[in-house]
Amino acid sequence: ESPEILLAGGGQQSAWEAFASYIPVGFDHILPKGLDHILFVLGLFFLSTHLRPLIWQVTAFTAAHTVTLALGALGWVTVPGSIVEPLIAASIVYVAVENIFLAGLSPWRPLVIFGFGLLHGLGFASVLGEFGLPQDQFIPALIGFNIGVEIGQLTVIAVMFLCVWQALRVMRGQGDPRAAKGLYVALTVIALALCIVPMPAVAALLEAPVPVFLIPLALVFTGCFLSVQFRQVAAPYRRFVAIPASVAIAVIGAYWFVERVFL
């Protein structure tokens, strides 16, 4: 559990203590609690195998949600969760569907991502409003929370990059296909085997059943194996990893949208 954070009491926390104590709060809102934000970030990741499009997207998203997080936390902008949450789900569907039809960064995508970032920032502000901010160290705590969110997002990207790295190396002619296939078979078997191993402590930490995280990873590893196995076809990584992952993300986002609007 996160350490207890003092919300009142005049000077009980220094600026540095407030800043440091809210970093894990922000991180926790992404990993493991922010499944919708995780899927959105993965939607950005699966657009392209190149770093530059990812940097453009993440920069636009970060700038936007930082603005609305601050405005929402200050109480200057308030939008009901009944509006924000369905729109966040819709944003997941949009980026995933665009990944299916576009193989690179379109001129409008950073602007659209910026707009979606404004929505996600309102979602962050809502969570932070429920958690509370110390009145005497409001700004340091807000900055710490936002940095925690950024660290969480970068962690998601880093983990997924490590998952697909060997497949990308083979696609670029830099890796050993046999070693890569062996690695992905082993990782798939391990991920699926761990799904049937009782891990109550891990499930409690994740606040979700362990297979919720491991099965998607196993599917990504399988896609990476196929992209190496059939590396002679056109755009194997996109065909076997990026597009299937984007389809899955779009389906989940669509389900959340329906659930948040109608159920």
Each model region followed by its residue ranges:
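Histidine-/acidic- and/or cysteine-rich, low-complexity loops and terminal segments associated
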Residues: 1-35, 127
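Hydrophobic alpha-helical transmembrane segments in multi-pass membrane proteins
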Residues: 29-262
